[in-house]
Amino acid sequence: PTVKKKMLEANARNTVRSRSRTGKPTRQLQSAWTDAWASPNALQPLEMPLQGVLSRPAMDKIDKRASLGHEGAVALSTYYVGQAVGLMNKEKSVKTIVYEFMEDYVEAVERLSNTLK
């Protein structure tokens, strides 16, 4: 719930590329976690898969405590996300999203068909 709320409130400027979770650069929501790893005084992340081995237990604890409303954990909470996160501004069911894709597809095919007439 914490990360979902952050995603719905985020825009492209709220994302960063960071090696802090996996050891490979991944786009994530900016958080106190990514800021700490980006600090000039921070250690360099380990190579993959070692960074994941290091960060996974910590992220699991952060996620668990964030779901209970722990303020510090909420600030640290992050997840992988693309720059298009700004397009996600309200919660939708998967069913609704699939139907919207289908409607958009039908409209696109109709427009294309009209250009071929």
Predicted region positions:
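Conserved active-site-proximal phosphate/metal-binding subdomains
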Residues: 1-117
